[in-house]
């Protein structure tokens, strides 16, 4: 009883879904009632069926048609049987005479009719095309012996592969050393070729020179006999009057600069020269950097450099002494601005420099060459460089050695700090926009306002250039574009209103 009561409690009239509203779709709603037109009434189906009288005329016609087809087929069979019996009787009566007549008629018919093109297909009929047939030996012989019918205007050779002219070409391997020797003979004379022949390793001999010696000899010979070669990074390091040219690639350790310096010049060959007989040491271009005389004294040159500057050397900035990797293990104190004379423009000593100065000399203390910065050409940039801290100066030197000028690097460092990546990004974007023809001042304004969006920078520069050509002031243009977010129409209206008010 208890179980029945529990079941009645849960499954009786009570439900958890009572008084819960539900939204049902249109397809679950009861359809609306449709009213029939006045006077419409359905006929009684039973009465209609009773009144219909079916005569089965179509079925009767179908049966009659089938019986007629059977009669026609039986008549055809009887006619075929009669014809076969008549032929059998004629053959039995005629005997050998009939056979000869039949064979004569067959040969006559075959002689008059032309032979079929394909006897196998000609023997097939439409009703027996799927039945297998035996191939007669005469047909195969006729097919084999019959010559192919070739048209006069058809040439099979036209469709054959033509000979490739490269098939008969003899491939030869290139002897790189032989080609190099021929090139050097034509450009630098027989001495270079003789040097190369002496340095080439002989087969089967134990006297094989090392790669470094060969490279060093080639570099020395190239500098001696090719003075018009492009700047290739060779540094003239004369040792007490004897100029010895060494490559940056060779590992050279430079000692600290003593009171009497052995370094007389740090130079690069010129890019262009008319006199091909001059030595490479005489073609040293003057650049702005620290230099010393033969007796170790520093010279303050107040005259501007008349020769080509460092930026003219193939588009690269001149490498200062800081570019050289020193192997010296001792750390030398840096030369401060108080210990150095005012080095506004320093010229490099060449081999044909003036005699040693007889006046009082200043002997600086020993310092690391890597701590001497490249001097900027602008005095203002030089003064700003002297005011920087050692870390900031190192950052500037790092970016300048990549090919940028001191002025641009100092300007970028003021805005981006000592982060080299941000400085390089700023300089790269600045250079790209300047190459597109925009004013450098406008480019700096755009980079300052829109640092992250290249599209907005381009739009800002185009509008700035357009409004500047119209005659508006740059200050007003900048304020208006910043206020209206580069909206051309609103900015132009604002500029016109300001111009009218003024």
Curated annotation (Swiss-Prot):
Changing residue 404 to A: Strongly reduced interaction with ubiquitinated proteins. The gene is UBAP1. Changing residue 271 to A: Does not affect interaction with PTPN23. One of its GO terms (biological process) is protein transport to vacuole involved in ubiquitin-dependent protein catabolic process via the multivesicular body sorting pathway. InterPro entries: UBA (IPR015940), UBA-like_sf (IPR009060), UBAP-1-like_UBA2 (IPR049467), UBAP1 (IPR038870), UBAP1_C (IPR042575), UMA (IPR023340). It comes from the Eukaryota. Residues 86-117 are annotated as: Disordered. It comes from Homo sapiens (Human). Residues 102-112 have a biased composition (Polar residues). One of its GO terms (molecular function) is ubiquitin binding. Residues 17-63 form the UMA domain. This is Ubiquitin-associated protein 1. Changing residue 472 to A: Strongly reduced interaction with ubiquitinated proteins. Changing residue 268 to S: Abolished interaction with PTPN23. Residues 389-430, 451-498 form the UBA domain.
């Amino acid at each position: 009883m208890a179980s029945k009561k529990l079941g009645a409690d849960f499954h009786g009239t009570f439900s958890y879904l009572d008084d819960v509203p539900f939204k049902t779709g249109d397809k679950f709603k009861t359809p609306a009632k449709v009213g029939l037109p006045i006077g419409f009434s359905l006929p009684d189906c039973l009465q209609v069926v009773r009144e219909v009288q079916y005569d089965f005329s179509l079925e009767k016609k179908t049966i009659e048609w089938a019986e007629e087809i059977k009669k026609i087929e039986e008549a055809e069979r009887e006619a075929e049987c009669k014809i076969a019996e008549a032929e059998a009787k004629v053959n039995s009566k005629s005997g050998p005479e009939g056979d000869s007549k039949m064979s004569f008629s067959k040969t006559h018919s075959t002689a008059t009719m032309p032979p079929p093109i394909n006897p196998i297909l000609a023997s097939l009929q439409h009703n027996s095309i799927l039945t297998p047939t035996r191939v007669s030996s005469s047909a195969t012989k006729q097919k084999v012996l019959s010559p192919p019918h070739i048209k006069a205007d058809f040439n099979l050779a036209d469709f054959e592969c033509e000979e490739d002219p490269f098939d008969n070409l003899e491939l030869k391997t290139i002897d790189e050393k032989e080609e190099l020797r021929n090139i050097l003979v034509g450009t630098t004379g027989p001495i270079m070729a003789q040097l190369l022949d002496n340095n080439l390793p002989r087969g089967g001999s134990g006297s094989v020179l090392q790669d470094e010696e060969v490279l060093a000899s080639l570099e020395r010979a190239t500098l001696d006999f090719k003075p018009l070669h492009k700047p290739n990074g060779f540094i003239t390091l004369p040792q007490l009057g004897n100029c010895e040219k060494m490559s940056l690639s060779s590992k050279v350790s430079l000692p600290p600069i003593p009171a009497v310096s052995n370094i007389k010049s740090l130079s690069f060959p010129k890019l262009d020269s008319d006199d091909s007989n001059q030595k490479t040491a005489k073609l040293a271009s003057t650049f702005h950097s620290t230099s010393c005389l033969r007796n170790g004294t520093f010279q303050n040159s107040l005259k501007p450099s008349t020769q080509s500057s460092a930026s003219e050397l193939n588009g690269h900035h001149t490498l200062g002494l800081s570019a050289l990797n020193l192997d010296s293990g001792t750390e030398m104190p840096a030369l401060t601005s108080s210990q150095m004379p005012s080095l506004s423009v320093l010229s490099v000593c060449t081999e044909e420099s003036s005699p040693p100065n007889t006046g009082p000399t200043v002997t600086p203390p020993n310092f690391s060459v890597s701590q001497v910065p490249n001097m900027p050409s602008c005095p203002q940039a030089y003064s700003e460089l002297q005011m920087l801290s050692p870390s900031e100066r190192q950052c500037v030197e790092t970016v300048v050695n990549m090919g940028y000028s001191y002025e641009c690097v100092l300007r970028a460092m003021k805005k981006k700090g000592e982060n080299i990546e941000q400085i390089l990004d700023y300089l790269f974007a600045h250079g790209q926009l300047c190459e597109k023809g925009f004013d450098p001042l406008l480019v700096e304004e755009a980079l300052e306002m829109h640092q992250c969006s290249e599209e907005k920078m381009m739009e800002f520069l185009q509008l700035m250039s357009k409004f500047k050509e119209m005659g508006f002031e740059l200050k007003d243009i900048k304020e208006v574009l910043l206020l209206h977010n580069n909206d051309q129409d609103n900015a132009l209206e604002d500029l016109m209103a300001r111009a009218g008010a003024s």
